[in-house]
UniProtKB/Swiss-Prot annotation:
It comes from the Bacteria. HAMAP family: Cytb6_f_cytb6. This is Cytochrome b6. Heme b 1 binds at residues 100, 202. It comes from Synechococcus sp. (strain JA-3-3Ab) (Cyanobacteria bacterium Yellowstone A-Prime). The gene is petB. Component of the cytochrome b6-f complex, which mediates electron transfer between photosystem II (PSII) and photosystem I (PSI), cyclic electron flow around PSI, and state transitions.
Amino acid sequence: MSKVYDWLDERLEITPFVDDATGKFIPPHVNIFYCLGGITLVCFLIQFATGFAMTFYYRPTVAEAFESVNYIMTQVNFGWLLRSIHRWSASMMVLMMILHTFRVYLTGGFKKPRELTWVTGVILAVLTVSFGVTGYSLPWDQVGYWAVKIVSGVPSAIPVVGDALVQLIRGGEAVGQATLTRFYSLHTFVLPWLTAVFMTMHFLMIRRQGISGPL
């Protein structure tokens, strides 16, 4: 293996990258609460893997969505475990994100020169909540349907553009197939890509600036 590594290192210069990744200085005041952001990332990766697996069986139509989820839970080998892990990690991600935000705020991690790190973190928090809203509707049961109807109707309170926003979200006047298609696309494509981009920016800035010092 050493010969293979040496061959790759000679061409790709792996050693400097490994040294930089593993040799970063960790301030002595860092404790377990500084791991909350990393746990949030782990939860996201778990959801990505389990969600990708479920796309092989889920059908995003109003006629088949509920039955396809039921099929995953009752017919697919370990499908019940797959979906349960997806749901548990989703709840854990939201909890860890909230605790991480509080930790950063209470320790002053948002102050100069880390304002942009804080901004990307806030965007990631919004994306995390958006995951929950869009994913909640995908089983298309009574809870999911009425949740979508209520959430998609909230923008109607906005003056002038409110009704147009509601129609844009729903794909028409009423909640239906177009709404489910939009939420499915957001949940499985748009939001994961946006989250991956902003997480990369977030972690690169942390690597560049380091962990903030104690108050």
